[in-house]
Amino acid sequence: METNFLQNLNFIPKENSVNIYIKRYSNHDNYFIEVDLEKNHINFGNKIFFNDSNNSIQKLTKAEDLVVFECVDRLLQKGYKPDNIILEKIYPSGHGTSGRLDILVTDNKNKAYLMIECKTWGKEFDKAFDKLKKDGGQLFTYFQQDKDA
C-alpha cells in the first residue's frame, strides 16, 4: 500500500511510530483506524469486527481489501456508526457452503440495513455486474437470507 493512498484518505503518520498511519473520526468520538505498513494490515478499531467475532485486524492480501478499507472509511465519514459495521458477514449458501458479504451495515436495532459487496475496478467489477444483471449474483443470494436490508 502506498502512503499517497493513505494520505488521500486523510490518514496521517501516527506519533512515535514508524510506518503506522492513523485516522480519527471526530463524528464518532475520535474513533480511529490504523494501518501498519510493515505488518501490512489494517486495524479497524474496537467496534468494527469480522463476522461478529472480536477480530478487527485485516491482513492486506488482495486488491479487494483496499476497496473494502476505502468503503469503510467513507461509511464512517458519512456518519454510519462503527458499531453498526460488520465485515465479512457469513451467509450460508446451500449444500454446506457459505459466502461472505464484504460489509453489512445494521440499523440501531441490529437488523440488516445495507449490504455492500466490494469489487476492484475492471474485469472483476464487470464480471460481477454482468452476473448481478443476469441472476442477482452474490449480493441477492445474501439478500434472500436477510431481507431487512
Walk through the language-model features, giving the residues of each.
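A short, conserved, highly charged catalytic patch centered on acidic carboxylates
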Residues: 1-149
